[in-house]
């Protein structure tokens, strides 16, 4: 009996050690990623400020570099907000508060948050008739997660494009489909786009702004609620993201 108890105790200690080592590696990776993400906008901001010290600059040139500085400050603010959310989620400091409520209302709030940005690119966001499913979910964070996918669609859809949002019911899940007619995603990148700080080839090619955290946060928020996110896409034919939450 004592031998069995010692064996169990030894196994528990080993598992705890492995868990702590994994958490340590995750923390180191997060710090490295954060440092890398902050480096570019900080370098740009530093460069603009150095140039602004030049007394020979014209007023127009000063306005131009001030505008660039403000743009980089805005980027940093958005990035820091995303980084705070990621670190809090990964450290389990954010406690999701699921309650039984209308998923339709949550989707509409996410739609409203993205509406002006879509209008600025003349992109139609079409909300097809949504059934009012009452399911257990965290309203605030689920709205944030849905917004991230819509916002991603806006970034990769050309002027005058279209995004369609639908909802459907399967045996165990309620599905939210967000489909765009944008540039599409290479099949090889399907797994990578949900990784922390990953920015796809189209992102770099077209110079699309973004931190590479939106889809990662969405995946984390949905998985923490027993759900998931899937993507179907083809280069040049747009993308369809399906977000699922248990009924």
How would you label these PLM feature ranges?
Residues 91-96, 134-138:
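Conserved micro-motifs of the catalytic ATP-binding
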């Amino acid at each position: 009996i004592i031998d069995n108890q010692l064996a169990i105790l030894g196994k528990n200690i080993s598992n705890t050690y492995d868990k702590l080592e994994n958490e340590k590696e995750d923390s180191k990776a997060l710090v490295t990623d954060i440092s890398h993400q902050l480096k570019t906008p900080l370098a740009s901001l530093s460069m603009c400020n150095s140039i602004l010290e030049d007394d020979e600059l014209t007023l127009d040139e000063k306005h131009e570099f001030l505008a660039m500085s403000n743009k980089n400050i805005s980027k940093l603010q958005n990035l820091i907000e995303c980084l705070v959310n990621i670190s809090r989620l990964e450290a389990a400091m954010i406690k999701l508060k699921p309650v039984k409520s209308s998923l339709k209302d949550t989707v509409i709030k996410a739609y409203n948050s993205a509406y002006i940005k879509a209008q600025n690119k003349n992109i139609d966001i079409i909300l097809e008739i949504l059934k009012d499913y009452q399911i257990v979910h965290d309203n605030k964070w689920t709205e944030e997660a849905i917004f991230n996918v819509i916002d991603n669609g806006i970034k990769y859809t050309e002027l005058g494009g279209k995004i369609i949002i639908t909802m459907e019911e399967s045996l165990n899940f309620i599905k939210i489909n967000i489909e765009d007619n944008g540039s599409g995603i290479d099949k090889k990148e399907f797994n990578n786009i949900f990784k922390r700080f990953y920015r796809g080839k189209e992102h770099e090619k077209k110079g699309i702004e973004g931190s590479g955290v939106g889809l990662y946060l969405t995946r984390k928020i949905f998985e923490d609620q027993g759900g998931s996110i899937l993507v179907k896409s083809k280069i040049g034919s747009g993308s369809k993201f399906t977000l699922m939450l248990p009924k």
